[in-house]
Amino acid sequence: MKLNVVNLPSTDSPLRKSPGFAKKRLSDYALDILGLCEYGCRYCSSNAGNFLRIRREQFADATEEQLGKRLYPSSDPTLTFHWPNVLAKLEAMLDGKRVDWGEGRTVVFSMLTDGFSPSLVADGTTRRALELVIARTGLRIRVLTKNACVGSNDWIEFFKRYPDRFVVGLSIGTLDDAWSKRVEINTSPPSQRVK
């Protein structure tokens, strides 16, 4: 399925405190590297939730300007919002912090969207963001994704280099590949995620 990619100005703070997850003791911080992931899940709160609803018309204006038509996340599963300068923003946020900053704390990667969206994995954005956090902080990284690529030899070797820094999970809403294709439009099939 061809994606409709819209580039938006990056958030000024891709790495931020995560009070909701902190209460649940899941993470202290959240790192989101794109505005809307590529999976088009019908049930996703990022597709129809407050984060995008507040800016609904701004996003529709951007789709019209860049794609020639008004599109909304809740009605178009091919729509994704990228932040082209997110790595520069992350680097700027980490400048001046001590290398041990965040030791004993956890960052969830990503909270609102999936940082392992296929195009970000392919162009190296995902790996570079994780490398920045590893090199410039003491944070543990909690990955939750629907992309089966985290089980590939390449990614397993990457995670193994930092065994005390990563907790990696695959989200599975169903074991039925056909149902998943209707509801989690562009994700890795569940049968690939459970291998």
Regions found by a protein language model. Give the residues of each.
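Conserved Radical SAM active-site core
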Residues: 2-167, 175-178, 190-193
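Short glycine-enriched, charge-decorated loop/helix-capping segments at active-site entrances
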Residues: 182-188
